[in-house]
């Protein structure tokens, strides 16, 4: 057998090889660190924007090469045309939820937008992709600004309170809620809240217009501020059923917040409704004074409630029932009733990016970028509504080649 002439590696040569590998790996590690330091750190996208990551392409939204029309001016706002790709989260919304609210607006179609109601009804059984494509093809998006070109406004929320009442007054249920009394006329001042409790003539005019009696004066005020409510009524014969007290009219007096009175006249600083009720329970001798600081009173009309009304709110100013989470109150001098609106509001309490319908208004809802978000009925909706006061952006969706 021939001998093997190759020498076995010495210990020193092994050490040299190991040192070479160590130096090489150290060099590569240093290079890697330097390269990493020169790069921007990875920033995860917002969860609202990562889903379907950029399936929201310009092609999908019909923006490619599409010229923008001229701005549109309203009495309290201006609408600036923008590409669909500029609407935050437009490809993420569950449009079928908004479609129910849109169908309600089609019950009382307004000019121009109402002309598209046949398509709205046809698409009610389509998926969100088909609905989105139709919106993009038939509408132009406009960013809403005030007349000074400010596009950021304020979002609040409202809801339908639920409370118990009796048809007849008692020691416990003694606070009346009224229908429209004689002499109340649109645009004309009527008696203040204080006068309704102290003026003989005002009290005479109110007689016979009591609808129900509630147990708590602050609950009555909340119901008036929200504009409507669901009431569990006990009748004189003991039967119990639900009714809706819907907005009918006001005394046309200016609205003043009771929180302003508390701020100016007490040390109390818990301005949520539970906080205000807590103050009232501890200061019964001053409750009337607090309530009288707001001279505005709302009058109601009674409406029956059925099982089908569980998912429907009260009728808004457009004349159709409101949809929780999909109806907003607006200034009609900024945005017409029945208009589809893309709403974006991001605060510490909630983030909203969704299609809503302009279906209501309110005395405090004035200005270009101003909306009141209908949260639904009951205590959970009330708790949500009480937390919402945050920045707002709005985009009007208006039919192509049409002027309001």
What spans do the regions from the language model cover?
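N-terminal secretory signal peptides that target proteins for export/translocation
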Residues: 1-17
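Secretory/export targeting leaders with adjacent low-complexity proregions
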Residues: 78-305, 309, 345
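C-terminal soluble interaction/assembly domains
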Residues: 38, 310-404
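Bacterial N-terminal signal peptides
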Residues: 23-33
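A generic structural signal for short, non-catalytic loop/turn and secondary-structure boundary residues
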Residues: 77, 150-152, 224, 238, ...
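Bacterial Sec signal peptide processing site at the extreme N-terminus
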Residues: 35-63
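N-terminal low-complexity, Pro/Thr/Ser-rich intrinsically disordered segments
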Residues: 52-86
């Amino acid at each position: 057998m021939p001998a093997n002439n190759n020498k076995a590696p010495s210990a020193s040569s092994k050490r040299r090889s190991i040192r070479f590998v160590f130096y090489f790996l150290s060099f590569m590690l240093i290079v890697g660190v330097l390269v990493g330091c020169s790069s921007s750190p990875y920033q995860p996208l917002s969860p609202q924007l990562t889903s379907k990551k950029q399936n929201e392409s310009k092609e999908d939204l019909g923006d490619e090469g599409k010229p923008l029309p001229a701005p549109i001016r309203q009495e309290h706002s201006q609408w600036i045309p923008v590409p669909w790709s500029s609407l935050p989260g437009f490809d993420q919304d569950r449009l079928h939820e908004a479609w129910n609210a849109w169908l309600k607006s089609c019950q009382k179609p307004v000019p121009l937008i109402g002309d598209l109601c046949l398509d709205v009804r046809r698409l009610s059984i389509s998926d969100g992709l088909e609905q989105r494509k139709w919106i993009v093809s038939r509408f132009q998006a406009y960013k809403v600004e005030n007349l000074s070109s400010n596009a950021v406004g304020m979002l609040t929320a409202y809801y339908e309170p639920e409370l118990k009442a009796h048809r007849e007054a008692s020691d416990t249920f003694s606070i009346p809620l009224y229908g429209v009394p004689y002499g109340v006329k649109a645009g004309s001042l009527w008696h203040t809240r204080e006068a309704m409790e102290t003026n003989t003539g005002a009290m005479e005019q109110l007689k016979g217009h009591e609808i129900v009696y509630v147990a708590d004066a602050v609950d009555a005020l909340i119901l008036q501020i929200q504009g409507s409510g669901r009431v569990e009524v006990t009748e004189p014969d003991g039967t119990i059923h639900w009714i809706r007290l819907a907005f009918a009219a006001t005394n046309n007096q200016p609205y003043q917040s009771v929180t302003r009175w508390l701020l100016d006249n007490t040390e109390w600083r818990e301005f949520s409704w539970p906080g205000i009720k807590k103050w009232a329970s501890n200061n019964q001798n001053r409750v009337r004074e607090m309530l009288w600081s707001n001279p505005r009173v709302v009058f109601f009309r009674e409406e029956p409630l059925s099982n089908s009304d569980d998912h429907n709110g009260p009728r808004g100013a457009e004349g159709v029932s409101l949809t929780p989470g999909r109806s907003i109150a607006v200034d009609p001098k900024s945005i017409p009733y029945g208009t589809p609106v893309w709403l974006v509001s991001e605060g510490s309490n909630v983030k909203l990016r969704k299609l809503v319908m302009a279906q209501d208004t309110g005395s405090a809802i004035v200005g270009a970028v101003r909306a009141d978000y209908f949260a639904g009925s009951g205590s959970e909706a009330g708790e949500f509504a009480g937390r919402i006061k945050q920045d707002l952006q709005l985009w009007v969706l208006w039919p192509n080649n049409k002027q309001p």
